[in-house]
Amino acid sequence: GTSTAPEELKRINLDLIFAIGGDGTTLRAFRIIPCKVPLFSINIGGNRGILAEAGIDSIDDAIHSILTGHYFYDSRLRIQASVDGTTTPAALNDFLFTRINLTRTPTMSLRFMNDEMKERMDGILISTPTGSTGHSFSVGSPIMHESLNCLMISPIASVNRMPQIIIPNEEIEIKSNHDANLIIDGQEVLRVIAGQSVTISRFYPDAQFIRIHKKGMRQLAKLGF
């Protein structure tokens, strides 16, 4: 067979992408495929495959449904970050802003909707509704319906127990008085120097999934609830 480098995909006229693997494969695929190309995710890993629409045992039925037009689009909000004018790839799940030095707890500032908050903490997690069943859920944040146009702010090990906050989809600016890492969907890491401003905002267009089964809160069902 033949293979295509990720950068080549953006120059090819594609109608549909199949992501075969786990959720990590799906997240990675959305960062490298052309923005408006829909994706069908097939889970063949050992994990839940929360983002997937089909498993290894239902691939034939899924492809038949797509070829016969029995499918629909599922749009998901994405976000991007800008660090001193340099824009990162889009994130479908989340951005984690976290300290590097494990012996000092930094003071991080958070500005959104004309308000500013400062707190000593290990990090800040900014999640989309899609990401609310990922890292955000593991740190105790609530699950959001996938269709909502909002963001979840989850402080990590806040000294004064700063609560999680759900806000409308507005720009969020983050700073730290110590060097930090900015992690995109748990996969790509960008170093942020102390005092640098990180601005998180909506990315257009939304991610497009191909779905064949209508469900209310599909990600919640994958968690076993």
Residue ranges of predicted features:
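ATP/nucleoside-binding phosphotransfer catalytic cores, i.e., glycine-rich phosphate-binding loops
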Residues: 84, 89, 97-98, 102, ...
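Gly/Ser/Thr-rich active-site loops/lids in small-molecule metabolic enzymes
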Residues: 118-161
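Short glycine-/acidic-enriched loop or helix-start segments at secondary-structure transitions
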Residues: 28-30, 50-51, 107, 136-138, ...
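Proline-centered loop/turn at the N-terminus of a beta-strand
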Residues: 38-40
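Short glycine-rich anion-binding loops that position phosphate/pyrophosphate groups of nucleotides
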Residues: 22-25, 45, 130-133
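Catalytic core of DAGKc-family lipid kinases
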Residues: 45-122
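N-terminal glycine-/serine-/threonine-rich phosphate-binding loop
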Residues: 1-35, 68-69
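Short, solvent-exposed amphipathic alpha-helical segments in soluble enzyme
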Residues: 34-35, 140-144, 170, 215
